[in-house]
Amino acid sequence: DVPRAASDNTFATASRINMGDTLNGSITETKDYNNYQFQLDSAGCITLNMTAYMRYYCIRIYETDGTEIWYTDSNEWNETVGYRRDEYNIYLEKGTYYIQINGYRREDYDKVTGEYTCRTSFTSSGVTNREDDNSFADANNITIGDKIVGQISVNDDFDTYKFTLSQV
């Protein structure tokens, strides 16, 4: 379990976490957001296993400049059950990110309160390409026959490669 910072409502005061940590939190009348900062040393897939004991919730992922790159919303529970479980697999590039968990519906910003548990994990993609390779000018040089491992992520739409043929 990760102890949350007393005031983690901003990115500057976000609780630092590692993939593999379990996040236990609550959204209250006076605490709208819980922000967590994490770092990936390589490109890969983060998995978020969310169990929410509130009528609905929203998870957002941001880059360090504040750009939102992924979100989930419309996660409304079955009132008879009293909770909702979801699993998300999000492919990201190497870097530092913020996860924000809140009790707002994205489309109308109605707020609810409640508890949640979010288990995190990470699987490296083992990419062999060099980033930034999103243009012809920055393309990765390859040789015919090379094994290439790349990844298309929520924050990286392209991997570009170039090669030369010596015979026609």
Regions found by a protein language model. Give the residues of each.
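Surface-exposed beta-strand/loop patches in noncatalytic accessory domains
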Residues: G25-I27, M54-R84, Y104-E107, Q151
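C-terminal edge strands of extracellular/lumenal beta-sandwich accessory domains
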Residues: D1-I17, N34-Y36, I61-E68, Y88, ...
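Non-catalytic, beta-strand-enriched accessory regions in extracellular/secretory proteins
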Residues: M19-T47, Y83-Y88, Y98, D146-V168
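Short consensus segments that form the blades of beta-propeller domains
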Residues: N49-M50, Y109
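Exposed beta-strand and adjacent loop surfaces of beta-rich binding modules
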Residues: C45, Y56-C58, E115-T117
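A cross-taxa feature marking solvent-exposed loop/turn segments within ectodomains of secreted
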Residues: K31, M54-R55, K111, D156
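A generic beta-sheet turn/junction motif
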Residues: A52-M54, L92-K94, Q167
